């Protein structure tokens, strides 16, 4: 599977994401509430809730906040009419973009999503317009410094489809969704903790972007993620190492 490591490609976004910690917590709490409402409050029997809990803990959410969100989901109330909505569209240079939302007001959400596409020169498409370009996969990202042979051996034995080892030592593991929990448990039992572990949408092909289009795509992503309703944004844009470095420099200048 070609492309740059998600670990490497998102380094330049860390400062901006840290500034949005409050919004990230809002999104995670919404997912905790909804997953508990739909599948119950026991993570052992609710994979969606288990994934949401892992994400919450990876962002240093307190157990108290986490447990209150789950309790809200079990109890119903104001969050009981949340629905999952998936929007598809085109970003700069024809990049395919998928936007996963969790909303209690479809009209508000589509208005915010459409506005983000329009402001950055893209356009919101119809259902099915770009989803055929993506495949649902389990994705595990590991920071540099782990025993590569051990990670690869355990992952392949547990059902991994593909493994990428990058020049800096970062590792990405890809699997079909049904093997996600098995791989996660196997590697964690061996003491190998992923930086991120999630079910994601992986593009079958990528579009190389120049600096201008990369900046426009990141602006689109930032605008989408500013909406509390948007949970995840997937795209098939790709940046070279040089452009990633230029973006990092631009975002860190005083």
From Swiss-Prot:
GO cellular component: cytosol
Localisation: Cytoplasm
Family: Belongs to the TACO1 family.
Pfam families with a match to the protein in the record: TACO1_YebC_N, Transcrip_reg
UniProt region (Disordered), positions on chain: 1-20
Organism encoding this protein: Hamiltonella defensa subsp. Acyrthosiphon pisum (strain 5AT)
Name listed for the protein in its UniProt record: Probable transcriptional regulatory protein HDEF_0869
UniProt GO BP: regulation of DNA-templated transcription
């Amino acid at each position: 599977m070609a492309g740059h490591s998600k670990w490497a490609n998102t380094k330049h976004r860390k400062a901006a994401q840290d500034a949005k910690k409050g919004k990230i917590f809002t999104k995670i709490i919404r997912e905790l509430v909804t997953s508990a409402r739909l599948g119950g409050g026991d993570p052992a029997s609710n994979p969606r809730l288990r994934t949401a809990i892992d994400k919450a803990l990876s962002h240093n959410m307190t157990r108290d906040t986490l447990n209150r969100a789950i309790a809200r989901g079990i109890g119903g109330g104001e969050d009981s009419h949340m629905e999952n909505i998936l929007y598809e569209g085109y970003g700069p240079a024809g990049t395919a973009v998928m936007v996963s939302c969790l909303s209690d007001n479809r009209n508000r959400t589509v208005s915010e999503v459409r506005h983000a596409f329009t402001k950055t020169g893209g356009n919101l498409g119809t259902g099915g317009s770009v989803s055929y370009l993506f495949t649902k996969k389990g994705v595990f990202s590991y920071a540099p410094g782990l025993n590569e042979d051990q990670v690869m051996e355990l992952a392949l034995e547990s059902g991994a489809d593909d493994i990428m080892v990058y020049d800096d030592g970062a590792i990405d593991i890809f699997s079909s969704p049904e093997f996600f929990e098995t791989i996660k448990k196997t590697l964690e039992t061996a003491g190998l903790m992923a930086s991120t572990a999630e079910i994601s949408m992986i593009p079958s092909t990528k579009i190389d972007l120049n600096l201008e289009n990369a900046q426009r795509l990141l602006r689109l992503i930032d605008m989408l993620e500013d909406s509390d309703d948007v949970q995840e944004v997937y795209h098939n844009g790709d940046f070279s190492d040089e452009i990633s470095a230029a973006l990092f420099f631009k975002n860190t200048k005083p």
